[in-house]
Amino acid sequence: AKRLSDLTGEPARTIHRLLEVDFTAKGELKFKRNETNPLPADVVIADEMSMVDALLMCSLVRAIKPTSKFIMVGDSNQLPSVGAGNVLKDLIASHYIPSVELKEIFRQAAQSLIVTNAHRIVNGEFPVLDDRQNDFFFMNKSLESDIAELVIQLAKQRLPDTYGFSPIDDIQVLCPTKMGMAGTKELNKQLQSALNPPSQNKAELKFFDVIFRTGDKVMQTKNMETVSNGDIGFV
């Protein structure tokens, strides 16, 4: 959405902000935009539609004028929304709306094993795990403590030494869970200790059980006026 906004010069907003989220006297969520107060736009483009649940989709459609165009963009193979419904996938499967599927990937090279394995997984096939000369590597560890130790080694030494990557600028660690020795909370502490250890010239601020230190890499987790969910910056 940010890229589209940069190209068109039109502002990009979250659906909640677009519909002007509000609350009732009982504290229940509602939207100011609806069928009696529709959006003024003649064309509405919604990105990341796989993340939109049934209730939010209902509110969005109610706020779009009957004469307007509604374009949905998204990957139906991504995880469905946290809320109820699998809106994008079900709409495509219904064949009630025209849809176009883009199959050529431009973000990675055509010979990328990441691309190959992505297609294999979508097609229900087992990914290629034994090609050590490409850009997709699988390392088998059973214990959480061993996983955490391997991640620290990869981020601090092995990947920077092999490919010349900057541990801070070029490497991003993704975790499926928050808790546990291999979850985000514990790994963040270990990565901070390994890549940005404390020193006298670095200011620190403790917020509950998290220490923020000058030089830390941080990610925004909530949409706000000047920053978006997922934006990365430094303390």
Regions found by a protein language model. Name each.
Residues A1-R132:
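ASCE P-loop NTPase helicase motor core
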